[in-house]
């Protein structure tokens, strides 16, 4: 979790105990290029801390992909619709290259932070 922890601690004061709690609640995952981490009109129930690689978030509007953001090493991706409004995602999130990420249940993320 080197890149994730470095990004977090560069932005916020994070205790060693908090980092350990996070480590205890994540699962290491490997995703191939073009993998759909999050799909529109579905619940994901998870957030992903990106250790290595890059993702793209986008909407599908009249058959056209509209990119809304990119996330890279040290970043986090999740469905804001799901986390904040408890509704299915309106966005897709796909990997732009092979990605190593740490997956955490949204319920655990809320509980921890």
Model-derived features with residue positions:
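Cyclic nucleotide-binding regulatory module and flanking cytosolic helices
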Residues: 1-28, 82
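Short coil/loop residues immediately preceding or within conserved phosphate-binding loops
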Residues: 26, 44, 65, 88
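Short beta-strand segments in beta-sandwich/barrel cores
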Residues: 27, 36, 54-59, 76, ...
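Glycine- and acidic-residue-biased ligand/ion/polar-headgroup-sensing regions
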Residues: 34, 45-56, 73-74
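Short phosphate-coordinating micro-motif centered on Lys-Gly-acidic
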Residues: 37-42
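Compact nucleic-acid interaction/catalytic patches
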Residues: 59, 64-67
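Cyclic-nucleotide recognition modules
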Residues: 66-113
